Structure formats: C-alpha cells, structure tokens
Amino acid sequence: TGTHCDAPRHVMEYEFDGKRARYTHEMPADAYAGEAIVFKIDIEPWGLITDKHLDACMKEYGLKDGDLKGKILCLNSGMHRYFDDSKAYYHYAAGTGIDAGKWFVKQGVKCVAMDGQALDHPLHTAMGNNGMTRMNLLGATGKTIVEEYKELFGEEAYAEFDKFEYIRIHGQEAYDEKFGDLENIGVWGTWEPCHKEMLGHGIVGVENL
C-alpha cells in the first residue's frame, strides 16, 4: 500500500485505559498533524530499531527528555529508497519493536511516521510467525524468512520476534517483564508490539512515509 495512517482499532480492541480502541474518525483532529522532527536512523535493512538508536538521535540533535512531547516524530531509516512491491521493501525492511514503542510512550510524542512498510519489523508481523495467519513467507533464498534470519543472526536474536521462542530461550518471567503489559490487555506480545504500545496509549502512526 501507499502512505497511510493507523489508529488504535487497527491492532487492538481496548486501549491501555480500558476503553474501546478508537477508529481513525474518533481520534482528535490534530492527531496526525502538527510540528514534526525527523530522526535519521543509522540502521541496515532488516535491522531492529531500538531505544538505543533513538537515544543516539536525541544526543546527536541535542535534544533532552520532554523535547518531543506532543510532536510528530518521523523516522528516516533509508527504507523509502527501496519502495516497491518487492522482497527488499517488505520482507527485509528495518523496523521497530517493543523497546522503541515504550520509548515513544515515554517521550510523549503524538504520532510516529515510518518510511518503511510498517512501523514494526517484518518479523513482528504476520510475514513471520505472528498473528492469526503466521505466513512465514519465503525469502530470496527459497527458505522462509524465519530460517534466513536465524542463519544470519542466530536463534537468540530471532527470539525477539517470536513469543514461544522467547519463552523457550529466556523463560516466562523474562517474557512477562518485556511484553507483559501487552499480554495483560489481551494482545499477543510479539505481534506488532510497537504498534500496540503506541496506539494503545493514543499515539497514532503513519507508514510508507
């Protein structure tokens, strides 16, 4: 798809305040518009954008906690250069995860715009082993993208994207510490966790910026 906006109802039935998740037309009129800042993220394709990348941008731009409150944050990961109906743009995109989502909430931004196929890393989506469909798509080598990722980065790195692998490797307690706030509101922790952290706190999203 082209550039589009996400509202809470896209990924959840209830927001963190316990109220029914809102549709786009129920969001404030200024939720998607306002003063914006662009972070140029130093990340390779298929990389996971974390709070560490975002903290590095804050330092580089001379920003401090609180400076982004109420603003729109645009992420330039370089993925826009690959825009196409292709594996390079979809299967192997850089993207965010739970740590970035919590960071956005902490900083109080009102909208996050991503220059890639989704806010979340592709392995956090149904392209990998998440969601009702769990497609685990074939990659460029003819193997699944899960197999490819494990071969390149190892099982522990992959576990970040897979609830059952995370629990197997790190244990239930570690999983609950990292993803428990999502599970507590009835959503699957490793399935688009950045979306859910943001949108569940009323922070809207833009994809394919």
Whereabouts are the PLM-identified features?
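Active-/binding-site microenvironments in catalytic and ligand-binding cores
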Residues: T1-L209
